Amino acid sequence: SLVFDQLNQGISLLHIQDINTLELEDFGKTGNYIERQVSRWTKQYFDSETEKIDSMHKLIEWLPKRIPKQKYVSIVHGDYRLDNVVFDNNDNNIAILDWELSTIGDPLADFGYHCLLWHIAKIDNDVAKGLGIPNEDEYLKKYLSRTKMQLDSDWEFYIIFSLFKVAGICQGILGRVRDGTAAS
């Protein structure tokens, strides 16, 4: 569908912007993005931990040992998904919302988070195809073509890392609810 093509185009355009030309060198650190993110979400997880979940502790131990070498540096949105994009009446992407997690980092990690739709929601491929929703492989290939980036065998890591990030966010919310400090 045009909506998914526009989503793909939006994140692709974001990731190919030259941070130096845009004078955004100070918007964030350029290296070790995933290491910093793993540290951030691990800290949030432990600070908010409500009960010990062995599989989460194993993942926290596993992640730092498997981080791929960062090949690209770009603006990353941090929460690029369908409900953070505004479309006009013709399904054109006209605005990207919710920038509080944005920084400079690894665009492939950002795109992995964006693709969690295919991993969290069980999508029947025939139904999705009928609605014009591409499968993940088609969507990823279009992104790589648009950005001229290459992805070796690290895609699974980016998805696992993104699921970990979601777990860290959810645990942080749960901790704030427990502590009575949740905003809503």
Predicted regions and their residues:
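Short, polar/flexible loop-turn hinges at active-site or ligand-entry regions and domain interfaces
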Residues: 1, 21-27, 121-128, 150-151
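A cross-family kinase active-site recognition segment
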Residues: 1-57, 67-74, 101-105, 181-182
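An acidic site on a long C-lobe helix of protein kinase domains
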Residues: 3-7, 52-55, 79, 107-110, ...
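Residues at helix-coil transition
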Residues: 9-20, 65-68, 87, 116, ...
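Active-site acidic catalytic loop and adjacent metal/ATP-binding pocket
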Residues: 14, 58-110, 115
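All-alpha amphipathic helical-bundle segments outside canonical DNA-binding/catalytic cores
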Residues: 28-29, 150-162
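Membrane-helix interface segments
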Residues: 52, 70-71, 92, 150-154
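Active-site activation/catalytic loop segments of kinase-like enzymes and analogous catalytic loops
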Residues: 108-147, 162-179
